[in-house]
């Protein structure tokens, strides 16, 4: 299954490690340091020029030991609802 995270960007749901609210999670210095290191190593993809509201940590398809961080203008709550509805629809289909 795929999750639309903004503009023309979709990611595989099985690659998602976590979806985080940018405002609340960056209060921690550890999170800020992690995002800063990811940015410096070229592992951050900004989905839009709009102000980001969330970030999604995913495994890299080419190297599963590496992580990719997507910055999205869509709130973490909306993304989590989308993931939930994708999962519910999938379960309904396989139960038939």
Where are these regions (language model features)?
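Eukaryotic intrinsically disordered, low-complexity regulatory linkers and tails enriched in Ser/Thr/Pro
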Residues: 1-96
């Amino acid at each position: 299954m795929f999750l639309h995270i903004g503009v023309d960007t979709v990611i595989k749901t099985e690659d998602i490690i976590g979806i985080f609210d940018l405002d609340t999670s960056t209060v921690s210095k550890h999170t800020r340091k992690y995002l800063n290191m990811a940015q410096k190593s070229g592992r951050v993809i900004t989905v839009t020029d709009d102000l980001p509201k969330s970030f999604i940590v995913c495994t890299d398809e080419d190297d599963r030991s590496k992580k990719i961080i997507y910055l999205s203008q869509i709130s973490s709550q909306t993304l989590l609802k989308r993931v939930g509805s994708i999962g519910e629809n999938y379960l309904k289909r396989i139960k038939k």
